Amino acid sequence: MTNYQLQIKRFVFGPFETNCYVISTDDRILLVDPACSNDYEQRELENYISNLQSSISNIQLSIVATHGHLDHLWGAAWATSRWNTPVLMHEADIPMAQAMQSQYNLFGIRRQPEPFPIENIKSKILNLKSKMSNFELLETPGHTPGSVCLYFPFANNHSPFVITGDTLFHRGYGRTDLPGGNIGQLIDSLERLFTLPADTIVYPGHGDFTTIGAERR
């Protein structure tokens, strides 16, 4: 495999302080969990991505969701319209994301959700890997049925890292008391994550980064 330059940028967006990540290489941008919840946050994200696009010709952008919860998708309708591309997520969480009003009602949020295009990430994985060859999709159900982690085992300027959504946090893990949660599945998913190299950096859906080695101790 050929190594390449990689950048990762974290934004903290919305009332749930959700981490949104932008991963960029020479010709691909992955926008992970478009959590921007207002105009200011949208402009902040747009300006950063526009700067990347202006410095690299023909760069392609994909939007990926680690799971279908509302706090990770506040800005999905805006982002899919802005960059004319769907949100890619695991098929098991698509019904949840399409029933966003139910999630709003569950949390008492008085807001009208906007629909946005969604596609099954597993049907697009070969296309993603063609531009980001070391990207691996890890299926990690438990917090939700379709939770996924994005694992990058190498890049010549960055340690291995994994974006874990709400599966694994610094000194914690995702709740399973929401619809679709399953503690047994979550434990299995955590055990699989703990088989990754100890120096793998964990970029979670909320809070600060950690490492696999620190969390499995």
Predicted regions, residues:
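Divalent-metal (often Zn2+) His-rich catalytic cores of metallo-beta-lactamase-fold enzymes
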Residues: Y151-P153, S159-F161, Q185-R217
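Conserved beta-strand hairpin/beta-sheet module of binuclear metal-dependent hydrolase folds
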Residues: Y4-Y48, C149-T164
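Active-site neighborhood of phospho(di)ester-bond hydrolases with catalytic His/Asp-centered motifs
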Residues: V32-P34, L61-G68, V87-H90, E139-G142, ...
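Active-site HxH/HxHxD metal-binding segment of metal-dependent hydrolases
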Residues: S37-Y40, S57-N134
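Core dinuclear metal-dependent hydrolase active-site scaffold
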Residues: V22, L128-A155
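Active-site environment of divalent metal-dependent phosphoester hydrolases
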Residues: N38-Y40, G68-W74, I94-A97, P145-S147, ...
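Short, basic, low-complexity termini and linkers enriched in Ser/Thr/Gly/Pro
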Residues: M1-I8, D26, N47-L61, I118-N134, ...
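Flexible, gly/pro- and Lys/Arg-enriched active-site loops
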Residues: P160-T164, L168-H170, R175-G184, F194
